[in-house]
Every structure is written in structure tokens, then in C-alpha cells.
């Protein structure tokens, strides 16, 4: 395993493939391994850099408080260490907040930015966000991480044919220390970039699930402010990179290769037949060779 150290953070990361650099940033409660469904498609054309954010995966908690700006600075320090002055960035959920913050910190260094089910502010400024923040924290404190993670996984992947994905998500999130999960959640609830969007110069693609936690209208408004393209994935919930792999990968490749977006009418949640194969395989790792893709020594 490869680690980067500085005075504030110790970051675990993986590097796959060759080509223009591309950073993939996971969401709250996840790790770099969450990108297993995307890496195989992306590493053929790009040098894919996959960090575990502080307090996630194999990365220990930060030495000071959790902040989105601190995460972004830590990733830029990692990229400086790797000799990467300029990179495309894809962020999922909280990872999208970190990606936006990175683009704001060094606007000229992020030519393309992909945001999956992400917003420009997570401050609890309406009742939905307030409820998400407080109920999530309350469940963790009352039930502990493992039980709270199972409820979250059930909400993300409720269909019977999503059993393998649901069990994997519950195991990954349930292994996160409660203090780390709550610290990252608080950092997200305190973060906003809405008043700094004018500083961004990246070409932006937003991928939005039809049934995400937060309203689609808010994402459409953000896309308008960013002059971004937006792909709406019908039938998908918050875990779009998991439940709509084909739509996610094709859309990201269109952004990264400056190609037109595919016809959006075809993008629906991956069909049950495909997901049933996941369940029969017994685990996501077997079906998509997660171990082969993400557990090799860095090249």
C-alpha cells in the first residue's frame, strides 16, 4: 500500500493506468475502493489516482479537525508529491464537495470536473438538508455505525436484486469509526462554495440521480450556474456509480475525452438481470474483479 505523509495528514492512495491524470474522490463513509466499477474503464486511457480521504479506508483521521478545505489541500499536497500539477477530477457525493474545493483552490489546474450527486452547499439551509444531517447523526449515536450503516445501505439499494451491493455498502460504511463519520458529516454540513463558483474555470459535468437524497431542481440550478452539462439517471438513487455503472462510465468518458454526451434517454438504472448476476456471484468483488483492479501494488 502506498502512503503520503505531511504535517496534517497521512493519505493512502492507489495509482492505476497511464495517460493524463485523473483523481477519483469517494463519498462520506466510503473509500477509494468504491470506484471499482469505474476504474477498469478509466485506467485504459488515464493515470487514475484513487485516494482514501482522511479518516476513510486505510487513511487515518487528520491530525486536526475535519474540513472540506483541509481535504482538498491534502489532495493537492499528494498531487504535488506525485508530480501532478494539473488534473481532471471526479467526485461522488461528499467527494464532489472536495473536488469543487480543489478546483476553487487552484482554478487553472482542473480542466475537467465531474460531480456525481453533489451540491455547492450542504449547509442545512432547508428542511430536507436539516433532516438529513440531524437524523444521520442521531442514528449513528443511538444505533452505532454497523446498524446505522445497514439502514443507509437499505435506503440506497432497496431492491431485492441489489442484495450484493447493499451488503457490501453496509460492510464498508459500518467499518468506519463513528467519530470519523460524524466528523466528516459535520465538515460537510459547514461547507459551501456557492459564493465562489465564479472562480471556477473547469468544464463541468454533473451526473444526478432521479431519486437522490437532495432535490434534482437544486442540481439543475447548480448546473446552470456552472454552465455545466447534466445527465439525469432515471431510476437511480444516491449510489449512482454502483446502481447505474454503464451510465456513469459512459458519461464520465464523454467528459474526459471531450466527446458529446450519449443520448440520455437510454440511461436507466442497470437492469435486474445484470444485478442478479452480482447476487449469484456472491459479492461485488468477484463479479467485477475488485481485488484484481484495486488491490495490486501501485504501478
Features from the language model and the residues they span:
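Conserved HGGG/HGGXW glycine-rich cap/lid loop of the alpha/beta-hydrolase fold
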Residues: 9-60
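Catalytic histidine-centered segment of alpha/beta-hydrolase-like enzymes
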Residues: 236-249, 265-268
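Conserved alpha/beta-hydrolase catalytic His-Asp/Glu region
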Residues: 124-129, 143-199
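Active-site loop/oxyanion-hole signature of alpha/beta-hydrolase fold enzymes
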Residues: 40, 49-90
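Alpha/beta-hydrolase fold catalytic core
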Residues: 1-22, 44-46, 85, 253-299
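Flexible "cap/lid" loop of the alpha/beta hydrolase fold
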Residues: 104-105, 111-141
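Short beta-strand/loop motif that positions the catalytic acidic residue
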Residues: 200, 206-208
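Conserved alpha/beta-hydrolase "acid-adjacent" motif
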Residues: 213-219
